[in-house]
Each structure stands twice: as C-alpha cells, then as structure tokens.
C-alpha cells in the first residue's frame, strides 16, 4: 500500500508536474500545493480543466464527449469523479501545511 499524501522529495529543482498542471489550468502560483502528486491520472483521463483554483474557490470543466455511458449522456461516475476531484483539491488548498489534507 502506498501513501499518496505524504510529501516526497523531488529529483530536480524544476517542478515535476509543470506541464501537467499548466495543461489542466492550474495557475503557477498554486503549483506548490500539488508539488508531489500533480493532478492525478483520472483528471488526465477525464480531461478536467480547472477554471478557478484558489483557497476560496475551485471550479473546473469536463467534456461530455469521451465520458459518456452507453446512451450517450454523461456517465454518473464521471460526474462523481469531477465532484470528488473538486472536493479533494479544495481540501488540499485549505489543508496546506497540515499532514494529510483529504
């Protein structure tokens, strides 16, 4: 079992997730909050783009195309993943500097 919330050391002084964070709309001023984990693989898969990312507000968009169920409408699991992602990111921003903000 791995601990995805405890800080890890980086191998270089450059931000290891810079390209990923920029691609998903995270402002550079907020990159330190995601230094060790980036945005995660599911954010990549669902193509979630953050339109607001600050301690007071986290917002994002996600395309319906590619995230549908068999009837062509947005999959409920994709909706739940978007909501959980926003909640986790908000917790990370509010819990910065504390152990395991989840």
Regions found by a protein language model. Give the residues of each.
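Terminal targeting signals and extreme-terminal segments of soluble enzymes
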Residues: 1-102
């Amino acid at each position: 079992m791995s601990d995805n919330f405890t800080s890890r050391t980086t191998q270089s002084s450059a931000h290891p997730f810079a390209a990923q964070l920029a691609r998903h709309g995270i402002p550079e001023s907020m990159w330190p909050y995601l230094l060790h984990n980036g945005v995660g693989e599911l954010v990549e898969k669902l193509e979630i783009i953050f339109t607001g990312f600050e301690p007071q507000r986290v917002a994002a968009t996600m395309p319906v195309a590619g995230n549908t169920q068999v009837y062509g409408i947005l999959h409920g699991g994709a909706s739940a993943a978007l909501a959980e992602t926003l909640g986790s990111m908000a917790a990370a921003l509010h819990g910065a500097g504390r152990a395991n903000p989840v």
